[in-house]
A protein has these predicted regions:
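PLP-dependent amino-acid enzyme catalytic core
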Residues: 1-131
Length: 134
């Protein structure tokens, strides 16, 4: 199944767009890092908010339809994402920010914001391994 919600991968250095896929790990033009680009019109046409409100899962998988994966599969059993936000009024006042919130990714398995990307990489690798064995 194709990732219908993804249009390509844009290089953060040269700005060129390449097809998004497992074989494209860095920019083929300059070796830069690639950012996934989404088809927001497609997402808007098929994504509905009410099922999201009904889901009790606080992890990143709550937003499955918005992620660049093919669908539910062998997701890691670790709780990734859904980490709390804390209001930081004193720091916000000092910095001149009216409403400042701080995300506590220390609640993730390795206490890092990188856990979301790592979980996504594991899923994508599993999808490719599954295709290789079909």
């Amino acid at each position: 199944m194709a990732m219908r919600n993804v249009t390509g991968a844009r290089c953060t250095i040269c700005g060129k767009v390449s097809p998004a896929g497992p074989e494209t790990t860095v920019c083929p033009h300059c070796g830069g890092i690639l950012d996934i680009e989404y088809d927001y019109d497609y997402i808007r046409s098929c994504f509905q908010k009410h099922p999201l409100r009904e889901r009790s899962d606080p992890t990143m998988w709550r937003y499955l339809e918005l992620l660049p994966v093919e669908g539910p599969g062998n997701f890691p059993h670790l709780r990734v994402g859904g980490s709390p936000l804390y209001r930081a009024d004193a720091l916000g006042k000092e910095l001149g920010i009216r409403e400042l919130w701080i995300k506590d990714d220390g609640q993730n398995p390795t206490a890092s914001l990188k856990d979301r990307a790592s979980a996504m990489a594991v899923i994508k690798a599993g999808e490719e391994i599954g295709r290789a064995h079909v």
